[in-house]
Amino acid sequence: MKRTGSKSVRALAAVAAIVSLFALQTVPANAGGVDFRKAVPGSGKGLTIGLIGLDDAIGFGKDVHDSIAREAKKAGATLIFCDGKLKADLALACAKTFKLKKVQGYANFNAVADAAPAICKAGPQVPVIAIDIEQDPCQAAFMGADNANAGATTGKALGEYFKKNFNCEYDAFISLEDYGVGIANELRMGGYRSGFASVCGAIPADKLKKYDAGRLDKALEVMPAALTTLPGKSKIIVVAINDQGIQGAFSAAKQVGREKDIYAGSQGAEKSVWCDIKNNDHWIGATAYFPERYGEIVVPYLIDLIKGKKVPFQLKVKHIAINGGNIEKYFGKISC
């Protein structure tokens, strides 16, 4: 039986559709997060490791890449990076390159979950750590989000905000999803709803509006029409599978003069949106994934796997809800 982990990010790219599509997958009980551990200098000397990147054009993906490169260098390992750019065919080509380059282990941030079997087959038969998206059947460990808990963290923050400010009254709950990333979408977006419901009760079906539009470009496309269906409404909740979806939502709302009508929650809290979170009091929460520290989990555990050491399958990040009031507590002084 397959073990199911979790996911991250703009690309990353409903519930019923995903349940049907991934009927053979099972969702494990939530495991506690692991602590970050910096690579031990010299621990990777003589080793060659690989990284199939999400997309370096995306802030989250670039932060992950940079952190893994930093820790690999510290460990003394040679890192071969290949950017998947959100495309299955490019990720497949990366795996083939790793085989030719004789990498001894690699991390895979391929964005297309159903392409994982082909990628696993094409690549070298070495230890693999999946990042944020399932990479069955070859993943030896899953590193990334505890998706259900990540969604619930900011979903609850939204519920608490609406309870305090509006007595839990709202006009719509717009969910910008990414069906292409598999069960991670169901867990993360369902987590938003369960977290919100824990404070304000279940979301009525007529208020829930779901779109396959978690990415920046997709959110820019669908939000104007979505807002058109809600004329005169000023308490609209918008959640997205990543930060970029919410950037797109606010940009689209601003174009039609309605940026103050939406209240948002996102996933990632990546560096590229820190100023947005700090300065926009309608960006109620963003679940922190700390992509700039992913390398502090991926690199030391991948080296352990290559050396034959036992590693927990679940290597999940400990999530925190970030907002304008606490962002500098966790990320330091932010100059915007």
PLM regions with names:
Residues 1-48, 121-126, 336:
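Short, low-complexity disordered leader/linker segments with a strong preference
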Residues 32-81:
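N-terminal glycine-rich anion-binding loop in soluble enzyme alpha/beta folds
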Residues 47, 75-78, 101-105, 124-128, ...:
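Loop/turn elements at helix/coil->beta-strand transitions in domains of secreted/extracellular proteins
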Residues 52-66, 80-90, 112, 144-153, ...:
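Hinge/beta->alpha junction and helix N-cap segments in small-molecule ligand-binding domains
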Residues 108-124, 128, 192, 209-276:
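Hydrophobic alpha-helical
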Residues 113-149, 168-169, 173-176, 270-279, ...:
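Flexible loop/hinge segments that line or gate small-molecule binding clefts
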